């Protein structure tokens, strides 16, 4: 294993976890998407990191924000978050030549939130459970298909659908590297890439309450939404593959394998 790479990614991951923890805590009714983006930029700079997403050609923000039917790559706007919104924050930190990537989805609520029993709590719990079940399969000797199978099983047993054309990925010197890490199994596990010690990957649960189909919005080349208008969820962590099992490089304080 490249110990220097791992140390640098551990440092970048620690920063990203701290930043996302703060961002999630600030998601309240009345805040705007762009305010969250600006706060993310400030927090990363204070920790001497850089925005990983701003290194993507053509993208000019520190976070992607997914509100309700937005699946991924939502551009932060002046939109005001309101009670009941389902909001995902995807963020990346670049430090000392290496990227880390992380996402979390939460419900916007005040202390007085009153909504019908719409199963959003269950929906978010299933997604996070699926991500961690998949992460537990991320150990040397297993294959990408073991991760995919675990993810798909939890999500579909919960009654939801895994998005097919958006996947997790390797991460390191580049934000997106090989191998692809789908949240579903296509074919046989034995035909998927072998997981080896030292690999660093981003495992993502990208899933919908409704059907799996997604489309680009007509007004930009980034935002992807559910085709049927259903709520979407996104959870992501950057992982190091070791002989002993997966190590979380990005994490919240409440994360536990």
Regions found by a protein language model. Give the residues of each.
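Active-site neighborhoods and metal-handling regions in enzymes and metal-associated proteins
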Residues: 1-257
């Amino acid at each position: 294993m490249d110990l220097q790479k791992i140390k640098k990614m551990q440092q970048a991951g620690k920063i990203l976890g701290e930043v996302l923890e703060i961002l999630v805590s600030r998601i309240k009714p009345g805040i705007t998407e762009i305010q969250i983006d600006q706060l993310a930029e400030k927090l990363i700079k204070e920790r001497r990191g850089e925005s990983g997403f701003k290194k993507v050609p053509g993208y000019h923000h520190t976070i992607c924000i997914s509100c309700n039917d937005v699946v991924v790559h939502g551009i932060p706007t002046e939109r005001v978050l309101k009670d009941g919104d389902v909001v995902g924050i995807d963020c990346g930190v670049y430090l000392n030549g290496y990227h880390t990537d992380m996402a979390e989805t939460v419900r916007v609520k005040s202390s007085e939130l009153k909504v019908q029993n719409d199963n959003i709590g269950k929906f978010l719990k299933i997604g996070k459970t699926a991500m961690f079940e998949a992460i537990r399969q991320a150990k040397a000797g297993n294959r990408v298909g073991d991760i995919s199978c675990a993810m798909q099983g939890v999500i579909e047993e919960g009654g939801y659908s895994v998005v097919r054309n958006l996947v997790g990925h390797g991460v390191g010197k580049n934000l997106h590297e090989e191998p692809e890490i789908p949240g579903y199994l296509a074919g046989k596990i034995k035909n998927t890439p072998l997981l080896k010690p030292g690999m660093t990957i981003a495992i993502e649960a990208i899933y919908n309450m409704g059907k799996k189909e997604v489309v680009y919005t007509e007004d930009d080349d980034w935002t992807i939404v559910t085709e049927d208008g259903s709520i979407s969820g996104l959870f992501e962590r950057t992982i190091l593959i070791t002989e002993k099992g997966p190590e979380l490089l990005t994490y919240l304080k409440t994360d536990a394998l």
